[in-house]
Amino acid sequence: MHIVITGGSGYLAGRIIEKILNSTDHEISVISQKKSSFFINPRVKHSSWNESDKINNTVSSADVILHTAGFNAPESSKNPDKAVDFARKSTKRIIKAMKPSGNSNLIFFSTAHIYKSPLIGEINEDTIPENNHPYALSNLVGESLVENFNMSTNNKGLILRIGNCFGLPANESSNCWDLVINGMCKSAIVNKKINVSGPSNQVRNFVPMKTFLQKLQLVIENESVGKSSHILNIAYMKSFALSEIAELIQTRCSELFNFMPKINYEKPKDNLINLNYQSKYIQTLNKEDDHFLEEIDEMLTSLHQNCHD
């Protein structure tokens, strides 16, 4: 199988490439403006966004295209017009380059945050998006192009609306430490303190990276998953308040390293409704596949080792 991954130097793409290299013999092509340590692997072929002919040849020969490229939330806030423009142009380029035979699958990486801010209440794939944050809007622009693509061709485009992934980056230069759980883990080890910047009772759906990768593998290998809707929510089986996450990390530090980082709550509690973020079309992984604590422990252990090397 030939898998093309856009945004290959990014956080999600890095872990995806690592997983494919370690567990399959699939051919990998990456489209990315930035370089990554993965690109020295002979199994990984690299193209930059300014190499149009190379991109066209790469995408047209693909079995699966994972379109992960895009501005993250902070970048989108700083440059909203550029975020939307990149989402539109990059998605159009990928769609235009896909082979006309209709045998390739396009998987567009979107976000749970397109629904609302903050995420509250019952949310599934039928929920109408209403968030007007630049990050949400740029993702919705890409989604609309994929939906039009599905209506006008025999190709198969699938949209993944992904919860808040967390876990170690595969690439040390990956910009992932501003993510909530990643940032809490790093601060707990480096500063012996956990800062909770949002209301402590705000509830979010956090997805362990290993759980995300398992669900992505299921989507890639089983074309029927999500076929009826062309949209899939990627969710963890339970959502947690920020205070619960902070206390969990505090407890893991005590058990693993025999110290208790202080928790600093920066905002008062808010009158927030609970969150049930779920998918109607992809099964929740069984409890034996639960990687929540495993992902946190691996991140804490790696950070602790780096601080003491």
Regions found by a protein language model. Name each.
Residues 3-23:
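N-terminal Rossmann NAD(P)H-binding glycine-rich loop of SDR-like oxidoreductase domains
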Residues 140, 153, 165-182, 192, ...:
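Glycine/proline-rich active-site loop of Rossmann-fold NAD(P)-dependent oxidoreductases
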Residues 241-242, 264-281, 290-291:
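Active-site loop of classical SDR/Rossmann-like NAD(P)-dependent oxidoreductases
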Residues 49-86:
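NAD(P)H-binding glycine-rich loop region in Rossmannoid oxidoreductase-like domains
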Residues 290-309:
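Amphipathic terminal alpha-helices
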Residues 117, 132-158, 163, 189:
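Active-site Tyr-X1-5-Lys
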Residues 215, 222-268:
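Mid/C-terminal beta-alpha module of Rossmann-like enzyme folds, strongest
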Residues 93-134:
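Conserved Rossmann-fold NAD(P)-dependent oxidoreductase catalytic core, especially the SDR/UDP-sugar
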